[in-house]
Amino acid sequence: RIEKASSIKYPTMYVEPSILISGSTNSLDVGILYARTIPLIVHDSIHVVIQISAPLVAYGLKGTIHAILAHEFLHYLELVTRLSKTELLSDEISSNLFENVYSDNTRLLEPRSVFNDNMLISHITKKFPSGFRDYKLEDKVIKFWIEQKLPVSKISLDTNTVKLNAIQLSNIKLDELLLQQLEIIKTKNSKLRKKRLY
């Protein structure tokens, strides 16, 4: 559905057989990560993959799954844009969940600039007004996954990073068609953001 709505191939993805819990080591601020976009280093080259948690697949409603996968797709496009311009090193990571949600919302492309599927856009905007929250899904994950002692991976928000050296950055091979599509999307995105400001 996401490929059809964007005319762009979805990146490699895999299902992680655990739930990822993120938070700050010095705070009660904790969040469940149902999916995340990860740049992996393979043979001194960078490949971007989407990691999906098993509980999302097991307990998420179809619209929720589509919204999360579309949101991660926006992260993928943002990351590819930054990789193509080698702007990757300047990103700041906060250990505060609220600051990360704000940063997430200001960096990503407008869904309407990427997707031509109104239902998918509606799912994204309703599920991610300011960070993702689905209380029914959270309750199911806590009750049927975490409390059942199924695998849980804990990470600190400020360690959810990948360090790249100059060789890895120079070995990046990006799809030319994707870069052309991103240029069109960025133009649409800029127009949408200007409209929203006025």
Language-model-detected regions and their locations in the chain:
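Polar/charged side chains located within well-ordered beta-strands of beta-rich proteins
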Residues: 1-3, 37, 51, 78, ...
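Zn2+-dependent metallopeptidase catalytic core
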Residues: 1-11
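Propeptide-to-catalytic entry region of secreted or membrane-anchored zinc metalloproteases
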Residues: 10-24
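Active-site scaffold of zinc-dependent metalloenzymes
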Residues: 26-63
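Short, conserved micro-motifs enriched in small and acidic residues
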Residues: 63-64, 68, 89
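Active-site recognition of the HExxH zinc-binding catalytic motif
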Residues: 67-80
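Post-HExxH zinc-binding segment in Zn-dependent metallohydrolases
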Residues: 81, 85-127
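Pan-zinc metallopeptidase signature
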Residues: 114, 118-198
